[in-house]
Amino acid sequence: MLRSRILVAVVGIPIGLAAIILGGYFILGLAVILTVLGMHEYYTLLRPYKPNLLVGYLAALAVVVGAYFLGLPGLLAGLAALVILSFFWSLFGELGAHLVGRMAVTHFGTLWVAAGFAYIILLRDLNHGMGLTILVLACTILNDTFAYFVGRA
């Protein structure tokens, strides 16, 4: 497990730093890739709860891409799209048991994964945003590293 973490860090940190420094479409591309990977991992773990994958992935991409092109209003428009798509799903899609629970699992994935990457995009666009975004990346890496080693102790 530690080997895979080191490998991801050796490859991922330079890619993340490059995307943050270059900004623009580089950070958008990385955010989209990481959002799709994060959503896949989240929905794989919660497969027994049957989230709506189409609604979740579409809304997640709308949140990240909307944040890049339109700022905070774009992020909010993506979240609104999530709610609207979910209501259409509940009206015209599969009904069945636990629909509200399935919608909740779908919504939470978008909020947890996609909104996080959208905020990274928004943070990068602020004054001194590159430094702030690198600080957030460093804090996240340190937090994950310490949690891993403390959890193993």
Language-model features, listed with the residues they occupy:
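Membrane-embedded alpha-helical bundles of polytopic integral membrane proteins
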Residues: L2-A153
